[in-house]
Amino acid sequence: MSNQFKILLFAKVKEVIGKDSIFIDLPLDESTSFNLIRKLKHIYPQISSTLEVSLLAVNQEYISRDQDIKINSNDEIAIIPPVSGG
């Protein structure tokens, strides 16, 4: 069995992928923030370097890059790339 996650995309990640959101499936026993990022990098290698410096928000709370948390299919998940410009 697996969980399906809706991932909200913003800024550069949204531009590169061309969508506001995407869906990712992860096995139930692998439904963690680290595995989600790993799978995103595999499916979308063109955003891999941006993901390295992006923030992950789960249910509107930022998750530390070194914190691997369990995620559920009903969680709101967002990838927040760094803001650039001037």
UniProtKB/Swiss-Prot annotation:
UniProt-recorded name of the protein: Molybdopterin synthase sulfur carrier subunit
Listed pathway(s): Cofactor biosynthesis; molybdopterin biosynthesis
A Pfam family: ThiS
Organism: Dictyostelium discoideum
Record key words, sorted: Cytoplasm, Molybdenum cofactor biosynthesis, Nucleotide-binding, Phosphoprotein
Glycyl adenylate sites (modified residues): G86
Function summary: Acts as a sulfur carrier required for molybdopterin biosynthesis. Component of the molybdopterin synthase complex that catalyzes the conversion of precursor Z into molybdopterin by mediating the incorporation of 2 sulfur atoms into precursor Z to generate a dithiolene group. In the complex, serves as sulfur donor by being thiocarboxylated (-COSH) at its C-terminus by mocs3. After interaction with mocs2l, the sulfur is then transferred to precursor Z to form molybdopterin.
UniProt modified residues of type 1-thioglycine: G86
Cell location: Cytoplasm
Lineage: Eukaryota, Amoebozoa, Evosea, Eumycetozoa, Dictyostelia
Family of this protein: Belongs to the MoaD family. MOCS2A subfamily.
PTM description: C-terminal thiocarboxylation occurs in 2 steps, it is first acyl-adenylated (-COAMP) via the hesA/moeB/thiF part of mocs3, then thiocarboxylated (-COSH) via the rhodanese domain of mocs3.
PANTHER family noted in UniProt: MOLYBDOPTERIN SYNTHASE SULFUR CARRIER SUBUNIT (PTHR33359:SF1)
Gene Ontology biological process: Mo-molybdopterin cofactor biosynthetic process
Major place of residence: cytoplasm
Subunit structure: Heterotetramer; composed of 2 small (mocs2s) and 2 large (mocs2l) subunits.
CC annotations in GO: cytosol; molybdopterin adenylyltransferase complex; molybdopterin synthase complex
Annotated HAMAP family: MOCS2A
GO molecular function: molybdopterin synthase activity; nucleotide binding
Domain of life where this protein originates: Eukaryota
